[in-house]
Structure formats: structure tokens, C-alpha cells
């Protein structure tokens, strides 16, 4: 529960890529639907940075927090890079988005299978 506003987080799972939806219109829809927590579009390449920043700005105007989907924090990135490369990438992601007032968390992945390499990668990314 968000103690600051006494609001229960209500959100949705966002499957869109960056630059597909018009940010202001999407944020207005989220607000009208009563969303208090949104998942960003996928930040997949450096060109998407401004789109995610704009998403955070529009969400902030409406009192909505955002879970940022950034490839640099995902367990797939962890699995395919060294620990040092992953740590550097996460620090860059935090620098880019982590201090924004609308930032809630990074999405580091989903649906790992316990007892597999995927599960170990997910646990490693979460550290």
C-alpha cells in the first residue's frame, strides 16, 4: 500500500514496444482507468530513452508510479553478460531512470523455471 497517498497499487501488464503508443494519451488512459502503477513500454535500445523519460514525466503529472522495463536490468541481459557488464548496465539504468519521482522499480523478468539456469540467472539479476 502506498502510505503517501493511502492508495492500493492498481496496474496492468504492458506488452508494447517503445514509440508505439502516444505517451500523453496513454498516461491519460491509465489515469481514467484508475491505474496507480503502470508498466512502461520496453526500453530496448538507446533511442528509446526519451520515450521512457517522457512516460515517467506524464505518469508523474497524474500521480502514477512506473515499473520500468529496461533490457539492461533484465535477467536475459544478466545471463548473456559478465557480472561486471551487468552491474555497469544496471548502474546506467538507475542513472537514467531510477531517480525520477514516478519511478517505482525495474522489471527484471518473469516466469523463470525453478531449478534451471533461467532460475539462477533471475536470482543473479535480482541481487
Where are the language model's segments positioned?
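Glycan-processing catalytic domains of CAZymes
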Residues: 1-127
Amino acid at each position: 500500500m502506498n502510505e503517501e497517498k493511502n492508495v492500493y497499487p492498481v496496474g496492468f501488464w504492458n506488452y508494447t514496444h517503445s514509440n508505439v503508443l502516444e505517451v500523453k494519451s496513454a498516461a491519460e488512459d491509465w489515469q481514467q482507468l484508475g491505474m496507480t502503477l503502470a508498466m512502461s513500454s520496453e526500453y530496448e535500445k538507446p533511442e528509446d530513452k526519451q520515450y521512457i523519460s517522457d512516460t515517467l514525466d506524464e505518469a508523474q503529472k497524474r500521480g502514477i508510479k512506473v515499473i520500468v522495463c529496461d533490457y539492461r536490468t533484465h535477467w536475459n541481459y544478466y545471463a548473456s553478460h559478465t557480472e561486471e557488464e551487468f552491474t555497469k548496465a544496471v548502474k546506467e539504468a538507475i542513472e537514467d531512470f531510477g531517480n525520477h519521482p514516478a519511478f517505482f522499480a525495474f522489471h527484471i523478468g518473469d516466469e523463470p523455471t525453478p531449478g534451471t539456469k533461467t532460475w539462477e540467472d533471475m536470482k543473479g539479476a535480482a541481487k
